[in-house]
Amino acid sequence: MLNVNKYAALVAVVLLLVSCFEKKQEPLVAPWGVIDDTVTVAEDFDLHDIQTSGELIMATVTGPETYYDYHGKSLGTQYLLCQRFADSLGCRLRVDVCRDSIELVHKLDSCEADLIAWPTPGHIEADRSKPDLVAELKSWYHPSFIDDVKKEETALLTTKKVRRRIFAPMLDAKGGIISHYDQYFMTYSRDIRWDWRLMAAQCYQESTFDPKAVSFAGAKGLMQIMPGTADHLGVARSKLYEPEANIVAAAKYIGELQRTFSDIRDQYERTNFVLASYNGGAHHIRDAMALAKRDGKNPHRWSDVSAYVLKLATPKYYNDPIVKYGYMRGSETVDYVNRIRQRHASYQGVKSAHMGFHPSQPRKADQRKKKYDI
């Protein structure tokens, strides 16, 4: 038997190595009690098989210490540590997010995962039926890895997310020019029935009008389109740094989000939800709506739902059975919506897009702009 508790530092909390059983063994002992094990697996699956398959499977629950999605990038102390271990094996890491700790143990017991991790410290024992994997993990691990991955995550969360040049939020107030790309906003905002100035306000929030902007997660261009999203929308990845193609992709994506939230009949409110989903993901916003509805709030009013978007950062809420997609850093999403709305209001004095200024011809004044990480 392997006492995993003494290796708890490996993941800052408990990381349990997989056990695949040829016959029924003693029940697993977990912090919440005894887990009845009745699963029979005909064949062991050890390190060589994992490396041959090219995939290491980590099962976990959502949370800031375990695993979460942040603007298209997977994070969490345990996730980052398991990713390093998978890299050392020459494997890709697949994450299987479970509902709760009991599901985690059964994933382990039924050999559906190679590693499991959860945020509650405690004593766990497991049959050592994957000795090669256990030995490899023990050989690979060094106590400094915990500090390393925590520093890596902290750096990602505290540094500015998008490398971009800073441009003024209003290119020429007297001339009625918001940006070099006003004509594109005016053209493609019609497809989604948005005020073009709202799309411009969103663009400034995403990239400060820098067509070469790129985020730490790989989002690109004016409207910060992820490569996978571009594939889904039928826009070539190679064109994401082209202003018009990027804005076309954004308009298509916004259109999809509008259809996703078509149950919100008020257009102003629906736009708030679309903006929030563009930033934080529609699934998380639907989770917040479900919580609001359960608590007697209006799930179609952003002022009600935004409070629950913020609450999805706390275990009481992201572990609630009604929540399907777990932890969310909601403060950034709420701030995102607020900033775009405020900037849109500041653009209201611009009556129409300037007709004589082509996006491919930046003004000389812009050459004085310096490059920053913001």
Task: Describe each PLM feature range.
Residues 124-126, 272-346:
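Catalytic and substrate-binding regions of cell-wall glycan-acting enzymes that process beta-1,4-linked
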Residues 17-19:
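C-terminal motif of bacterial Sec signal peptides marking the signal peptidase cleavage site
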Residues 332-374:
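Low-complexity, Gly/Ser/Thr/Pro-rich intrinsically disordered linker/tail segments
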Residues 37-38, 160-209, 244-247, 262-265, ...:
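Export/targeting segments at the very N-terminus of extracytoplasmic proteins
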Residues 21-41, 47-48, 76-88, 124-160, ...:
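Extended ligand-binding regions for polar small-molecule ligands
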Residues 212-238, 246-256, 340:
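Substrate-binding/active-site groove segments that recognize
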Residues 26-27, 31-119, 185:
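Extracytoplasmic small-molecule ligand-binding "clamshell" domains
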Residues 62, 121-139, 165-169, 309-316:
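Periplasmic-binding protein-like
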